[in-house]
Amino acid sequence: ILKAATPTSRPSGLRELLWQPEHLYPADVLSSMTNATTGARYEIDTTRNWSRRDFPDLAARVEAPVHFTVAEYERVWQSGPDDLAQIGALFTASPRFVTGEQTGTGHNLSLSYHATAYHLKVLSFVEECVAAQRTRTQSPATETSQKREAG
């Protein structure tokens, strides 16, 4: 479906790919996001090379922890256990790769009725990363050294 996109028209079936099941999204989101006749010009080049070239190249350069969430009703990404393991293997520079599934959503997680739950999971992951960093920098040896300097 995505390969059929052009700068002047969206391919048939795009709404079904990105915005289903329909009842998982507020009506105003669906009407405002899916009534456009064309996409941004950059989307054409991005989608054409994304999965085979651009995503693997970018993933290999990510040096931060990654939380990769797929939708319960995902239709863009292949999201079985083997698929997620293959995606995780692309993040070779990342110190941590975690996957999750967001229930009650289609591909556009951030715009569904479950967007708040999804974003809370993202923030929770960020907090875990911050806490882990604090734990590493506040090892017992570091704390002892700081107490000596303060005392």
Locations of regions flagged by a protein language model:
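Catalytic active-site module of serine/aspartate enzymes centered on a nucleophile-bearing elbow/loop
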Residues: 96-151
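Conserved loop-alpha-helix segment in the C-terminal half of the alpha/beta-hydrolase fold
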Residues: 72-105
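Short amphipathic alpha-helical segments and helix-helix/interface helices
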Residues: 56-59, 87-88, 123
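Hydrophobic, Leu/Ile/Phe/Ala-enriched alpha-helical segments that form helix-helix packing faces
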Residues: 59, 91, 126-130
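Alpha/beta-hydrolase
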Residues: 1-80
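Generic structural microfeature
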Residues: 54-57, 94, 117
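N-proximal short alpha-helices
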Residues: 31-35, 91-99, 139
